[in-house]
């Protein structure tokens, strides 16, 4: 009898535990007998720790799943409505709250409607809930991101790019998995529940990640989804088109996505001023005056995907990708020595390049008991690169200099990664992982100078990171061990590293917080720089690889303060970076009096960057203004040079939306970069955009640089022996008109899509370039 009681009790406890792991909270938000669409719904603990959140659908409904037993507060708010808080004490079973009534309210302050903040500051990320107006006026996931105005994030709809003011890349994700920009372009705004913004990402996201933007989207069931996003110019060969299809059947999902990019302009040219100084003290300056020529590029990206989910317990995903890119460039210029302008030579340069990159990505994710998870990912990639370049200098049809070079490259790589995560307490989490990468590059160089390279590269890392929160104080500490190996014939290196990372934050109130972040990382030389290869640039210059390059160390420190008051918000950010023995360029004269441009481990490089960002809006739910400005100070020390440089930059943007219409105007001046001995001028541009949305169709237009007729970019080289300055121009980048159409349709979707949480990729071909 006692055994039966014990067995029955055990079974009952197990059922309660299993049931508690799938607690649901749902309801319907109504005001004056009408459903409230896109109301913000947030579930949090009694001490304001975020648990789950989202927005109501078109019928005012919401549902939150997989909630653990406990006591919570359900906060409901919406633009033009009073907020309501519902206490959910001792929640242990699923609960249907039924109809929840909220009252209309409009608070006016000097003719401006003040709305509640939609940003929740969690310990390791910011949780941003889109407003109803943003969801209705945005045409896709990218335009929604632009309207949400995340701090230190820049959205460029003309080029379909998302960048950060900080050093590194921006990772785009959907439900935790790395997503391509093409996925965001065909994402329906109404499917977005919230955006989780990791502006200080942890070790699991990699060393070169400035920010992670994770779209948390609705999970659908059976049916399918078709979407198209087309962006094309009627007067210039300029286009970016995306198409995606997803079909669900029971526990399986099949997907196909295709992207096509093309560019072609007939009015591209460059101007160069190059000075060459010899050991005997003599020197001369050569001038290159460009003649308008053609450049073109196009690419295709195809992905086939299959995934299988078993009731949210485990998830398998397989993806086969193929990317193809081809470019052509023709340059014509007149060459002459500044001291002898009458002696003119004609320069002709023609180059083509082609890259084919197939890959296979296998992914497995498993949810374990006690709030644990395990992720395993394996990616294999092959990159086939073919390029050739011809360069001549001469008079009429008599070449005085004739250079021809070809590169045939083959690179094979494998990336394997495993991640384990566990929630230790309600306010702390442990994350640990291992990653292994193996690469083999086999390149053949031909033409005037021939050579072959075979390079092997291995990287292995393991990390552990612990994060938590105590009242208003939050922290994170991580430690990463790494091993790097490179071998080319008898040359190479082996390097072991132990790298710490620290994050400390304090939240003074819901609207003010301050954070410090420090880390040490290593940077490896690229395979393209380490090949024992020489490539002729022109009659005077040579580009050379350097197999003696070594890994170098990077130290980063960041201090940030964020504040919000009504319609005003701001961010103050101060960063300092120091690189010890960085790989930077140098120019030397060889025994043949040729000027050899190569890379070497130099002494140090420093960058100091204070930045201020201010935002105002939305004013009457129509206008939003933003302005950011900063200063970059660089200190670059080489073995035989020392340069300092200071650059002031700014960026301004105004956005407007009214009913189904939305528009924006953004402008940015040169944000220059100085590294080694090279000053690279950033873009100075402005863009105007207007769009109209009707149901699932969004049509619009954009104009790049509508108010100028001279677009250029360039740079300077401050070498002692061969300084230079260059500008290159693209006439078609002025008053470039682009029409845009976005359309999507879904049918019968009820299957809950579970996304993978990591994605690895290899896109570096590892070949040395020979052009200027």
Name every feature range the model reports, one short phrase each:
Residues 485, 510-557, 574-592, 707-722:
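Surface-exposed extracellular loop regions of Gram-negative outer-membrane beta-barrel proteins
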Residues 142-177:
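Extracytoplasmic beta-strand/coil segments of soluble accessory domains associated
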Residues 413-415, 455, 461, 546, ...:
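Outer membrane beta-barrel strand-and-loop segments of large Gram-negative receptors
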Residues 175-202, 304:
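Short acidic/polar hinge/loop motifs at secondary-structure boundaries
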Residues 96-101, 111, 141-144, 160-162, ...:
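N-terminal periplasmic accessory domains that precede
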Residues 299-327, 350-500, 507, 568-576, ...:
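Face-selective signature of the C-terminal outer-membrane beta-barrel domain
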Residues 40-44, 77-79, 95-134, 143, ...:
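Short, acidic, small-residue-rich periplasmic hinge/interaction motif at the N-terminus
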């Amino acid at each position: 009898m006692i055994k039966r009681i014990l067995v029955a009790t055990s079974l009952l406890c197990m059922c309660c535990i299993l049931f508690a792991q799938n607690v649901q909270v749902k309801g319907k938000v109504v005001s004056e007998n009408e459903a409230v669409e896109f109301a913000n719904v947030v579930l949090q603990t009694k001490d304001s720790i975020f648990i789950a959140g989202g927005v109501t659908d078109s019928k005012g409904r919401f549902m939150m799943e997989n909630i653990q037993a406990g006591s919570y507060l359900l906060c409901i708010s919406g633009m033009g409505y009073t907020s309501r808080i519902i206490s959910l004490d001792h929640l242990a079973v699923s609960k249907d709250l039924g109809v929840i009534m909220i009252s209309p309210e409009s608070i006016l302050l000097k003719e401006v409607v003040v709305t509640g903040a939609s940003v929740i500051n969690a310990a390791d990320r910011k949780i941003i809930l889109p407003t109803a107006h943003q969801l209705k006026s945005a045409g896709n996931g990218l335009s929604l991101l632009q309207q949400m105005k995340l701090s230190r994030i820049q959205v460029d709809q003309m080029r379909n790019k998302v960048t950060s003011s900080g050093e590194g890349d921006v990772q785009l994700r959907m439900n935790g998995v790395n997503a391509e920009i093409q996925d965001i372009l065909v994402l329906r705004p109404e499917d977005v529940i919230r955006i989780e913004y990791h502006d200080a990402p942890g070790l699991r996201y990699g060393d070169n990640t400035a920010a992670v933007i994770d779209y948390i989207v609705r999970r659908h069931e059976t049916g399918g989804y078709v979407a198209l996003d087309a962006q094309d110019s009627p007067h210039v060969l300029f286009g970016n088109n995306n198409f995606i299809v997803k079909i669900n059947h029971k526990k399986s999902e099949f997907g196909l996505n295709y992207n096509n990019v093309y560019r072609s302009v007939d009015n591209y040219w460059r101007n160069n001023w190059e000075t060459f100084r010899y050991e005997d003290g003599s020197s001369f300056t050569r001038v290159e005056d460009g003649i308008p020529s053609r450049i073109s590029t196009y690419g295709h990206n195809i992905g086939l995907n299959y995934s299988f989910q078993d009731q949210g317990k485990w998830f398998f995903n397989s993806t086969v990708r193929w990317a193809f890119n081809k470019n052509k460039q023709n340059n014509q210029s007149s060459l002459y020595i500044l001291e002898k302008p009458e002696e003119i030579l004609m320069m002709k340069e023609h180059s083509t390049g082609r890259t084919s990159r197939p890959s296979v990505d296998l992914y497995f994710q498993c949810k374990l008991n006690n709030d644990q998870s395990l992720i395993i990912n394996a990616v294999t990639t092959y990159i086939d690169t073919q390029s050739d370049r011809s360069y001549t200098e001469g008079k009429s049809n008599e070449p005085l200099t004739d250079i021809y070079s070809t590169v045939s490259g083959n690179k094979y790589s494998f990336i394997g990664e495993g991640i384990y995560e566990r929630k230790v307490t309600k306010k702390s989490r442990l994350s640990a992982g291992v990653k292994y990468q193996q690469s083999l590059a086999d390149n053949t160089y031909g033409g005037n100078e021939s050579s072959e390279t075979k390079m092997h590269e291995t990287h292995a890392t393991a990390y552990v990171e612990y994060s938590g929160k105590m009242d208003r104080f939050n922290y994170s500490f991580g430690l990463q061990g790494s091993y790097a190996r490179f071998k080319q014939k008898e040359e190479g290196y082996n390097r072991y590293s132990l790298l710490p990372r620290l994050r400390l934050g304090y939240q003074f109130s819901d609207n003010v917080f301050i954070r410090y972040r420090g880390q040490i990382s290593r940077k490896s030389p690229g395979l393209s720089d380490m090949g024992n290869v020489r490539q002729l640039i022109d009659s005077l210059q040579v580009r050379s690889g350097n197999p003696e390059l070594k890994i170098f160390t990077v130290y980063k420190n960041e201090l940030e303060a964020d504040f919000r008051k009504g319609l005003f918000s701001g961010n103050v950010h101060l960063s300092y970076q120091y690189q010890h023995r960085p790989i930077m360029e140098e120019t030397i004269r060889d025994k043949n009096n040729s000027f050899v441009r190569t890379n070497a481990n130099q002494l140090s490089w420093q960058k100091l960057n204070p930045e201020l960002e201010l935002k105002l809006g939305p004013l009457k739910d129509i206008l939003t203004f933003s302005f950011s400005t900063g200063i970059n100070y660089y200190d670059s020390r080489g073995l035989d040079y020392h340069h300092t440089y200071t650059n002031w930059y700014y960026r301004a943007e105004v956005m407007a939306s009214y009913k189904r219409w939305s528009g924006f105007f953004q402008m940015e001046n040169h944000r220059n970069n100085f590294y080694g001995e090279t000053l690279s001028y950033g873009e100075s541009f402005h863009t105007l955009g207007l769009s109209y949305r009707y149901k699932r169709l969004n049509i619009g237009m954009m104009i790049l640089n509508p108010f100028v007729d001279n677009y250029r970019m360039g740079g300077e080289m401050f070498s002692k022996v061969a300084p230079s300055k260059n500008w290159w121009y693209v006439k078609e980048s002025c008053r470039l008109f682009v029409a845009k159409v976005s359309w999507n349709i879904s049918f019968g979707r009820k299957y809950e899509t579970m996304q993978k949480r990591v994605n690895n990729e290899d896109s570096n071909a590892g070949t040395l370039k020979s052009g200027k």
